[in-house]
């Protein structure tokens, strides 16, 4: 049984159950002003980019997983469960999935990849995806349509591989670790600048500085409210 089949088999067990009563999944307070409506809209796509794109994506999905949503991550060979937990992911509702096998041949690899991701969208409420190839426009549109149909949230990590833009974008434009002093000590916190944008309701740019994480291991705002940017 292939990975797409395994993911499809999970549909009956983990299928979203609150589509009618809840149209947005919660996010941590640090993200509420960066994401329109203060939550992840079901049926939408989110893209994270920049030097901390994976950490940002996990943190964006953390509150949803804590609230009961199942989260899958596909295409992250170096991601460990401890790192996900430290960013707030509830591991009892988190599944790491390897990229689809490539034995089928290079001509069909991208199609198999898209089918595997589509199966995960059917089964999970939030799906984090890191593409190792350029996603075809056709596949990107089909995945977006599947996401809308299923009421899931598709998170594109490292958006440069995607031809289609996301509904909401979060880009880390600056990141620096803090904690070292005079050549000794430990890296204890990471301060990042995040710029938010996107389409329609997300088109007005936003900017905020976050601890990802703070010295206490939390994801939180450095300044409580993000700074509005003038649309150029």
Which residue stretches match the model-derived regions?
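A contiguous pocket-lining binding segment that forms or flanks enzyme active sites
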Residues: 120-167
């Amino acid at each position: 049984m292939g990975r797409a089949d395994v993911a499809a088999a999970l549909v009956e067990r983990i299928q979203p159950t609150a589509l009618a009563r809840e149209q947005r999944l919660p996010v941590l307070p640090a993200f509420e002003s960066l994401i329109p409506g203060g939550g992840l809209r079901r049926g939408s796509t989110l893209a994270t980019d920049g030097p901390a794109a994976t950490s940002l994506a996990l943190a964006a999905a953390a509150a949803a997983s804590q609230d009961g949503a199942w989260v899958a991550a596909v295409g992250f060979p170096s991601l460990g469960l401890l790192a996900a937990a430290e960013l707030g992911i509830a591991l009892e509702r988190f599944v790491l999935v390897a990229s689809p096998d490539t034995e089928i041949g290079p001509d069909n690899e991208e199609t198999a990849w898209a089918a595997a991701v589509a199966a995960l969208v059917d089964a999970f409420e939030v799906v984090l995806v890191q593409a190792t190839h350029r996603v075809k426009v056709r596949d990107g549109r089909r995945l977006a349509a599947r996401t809308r149909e299923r009421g899931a949230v598709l998170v594109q990590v490292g958006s440069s591989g995607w031809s289609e833009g996301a509904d909401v974008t979060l880009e880390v434009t600056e990141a620096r670790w803090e904690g070292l002093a005079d050549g000794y000590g430990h890296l204890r916190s990471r301060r990042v600048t995040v710029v938010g944008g996107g389409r329609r309701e997300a088109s007005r740019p936003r900017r905020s500085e976050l601890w990802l994480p703070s010295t206490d291991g939390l994801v939180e705002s450095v300044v409580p409210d993000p700074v509005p940017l003038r649309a150029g």
